[in-house]
Amino acid sequence: VVLSGCSEDAMDRINKDHGHTQSVAGRFILTDVITSTAFSNAGGDLNTYLSSYIEYEVGVDNQLYYAETRESEPTSSSTFNNTWNNLYSTLKSARIIINQCSDGGIDYGNYTTKGMAEVLAAYNCALIADMFGDAPCSQAALVDENGSPVYLNPKMDKQEDIYKQAMQYLDDAIADLQQEDLIDPSSQDLLYQGDAEKWLKFAYALKARYTMHLLQRSTNKDADMEKVLEYVSKSFKNTEEQAAFSVYDVNNINPLYGFFKARAALGASESMRSKLAEYNDPRLS
């Protein structure tokens, strides 16, 4: 008979994964959050289906044809399933950056990175509110120090409360983006290469957008319109400052072009062409 034993510390180490890192610097997570926000959330199924619903383009084949004819896609639970999952995955990553850059976190002191993540968290929260109305948000996409969900069944939030969360993220971002980082995130920032002033303008642009979204619910529209004008004055001055995800090339194709090339499911919209002609829009030529 052979008996063996080990210390309690050794037993504690057995079930730990030593082959993978347990934490990543926030600036590296930032690259993924920017990419998934632009490519999958703003440029994925929401882009293709909604362009058909509002007649920017016309669905001519496969699922976009069914979206065009309203046969099944608008009400099918699977239509936006991928986007739904990715919105929360992206929001989770943004919140991880925010937590790591907050007091006590491994990236504490990197205020610019934190501000960038707060802008992106606001953007994704607002996408959830715009597309799904009431939805989990305040308790969703939160993880503990071990990466496990804090809430397995997050509560439903009212759409208006999700907007409040988005606006709070933007207010926090505006404060943080006017401070500095201990480590330069420019090489991981695919939007503005670490330019905090442009991120600040992006934050104000979103505040203007979301304030306008809520105007029909406003109790003082005149005051809120003044806020919109104030936010706009602090935002982009030209199209070169806009938050454009300009990384596409022959090896990294735009998701809309990739979808069209693979499936040819979208065509030119007569409704859109007629509207451009009505206003003598130069883009027709």
Predicted regions and their residues:
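Conserved, well-structured interaction surfaces
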Residues: 62-135, 149-164, 168-180
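Hydrophobic-face positions in mid-chain alpha helices that act as interaction patches
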Residues: 222-285
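Aromatic- and glycine-enriched pocket-lining scaffold segments that form the walls
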Residues: 188-240
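Membrane-proximal, proline-rich intrinsically disordered regions
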Residues: 6-55, 88, 104
